[in-house]
């Protein structure tokens, strides 16, 4: 289970390409690249940006908790629900 906000942010960041986040070779692109490679720490502004990109994961990203009835889930919750809804479930 991912418990640290930085770990949760990096998990979401891993699902994106750098071009999803910024224009190639821009200052922001290099910043995201450094974060992804582990040579820079993620800051509040990047956490906010990930929250805008993944609005359904916003609460989980900040708190580590989910509220499915409010549409606030996590990647692992969504993955488990997809498997349950699949044709070979159960």
Where are these regions (language model features)?
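A short, Lys/Arg-rich alpha-helix, primarily the initiator
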Residues: 1-24, 59, 88-89
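Recognition helix of helix-turn-helix/homeodomain-like DNA-binding domains
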Residues: 26-42
């Amino acid at each position: 289970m991912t418990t640290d906000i930085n770990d949760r942010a990096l998990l979401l960041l891993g699902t994106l390409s750098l071009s999803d986040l910024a224009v190639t070779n821009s200052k922001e692109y290099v910043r995201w690249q450094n974060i992804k490679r582990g040579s820079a720490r993620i800051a509040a502004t990047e956490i906010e940006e990930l929250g805008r990109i993944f609005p359904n994961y916003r609460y989980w990203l900040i708190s580590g908790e989910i509220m499915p009835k409010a549409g606030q889930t996590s990647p692992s919750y969504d993955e488990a629900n997809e498997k349950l809804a699949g044709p070979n479930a159960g």
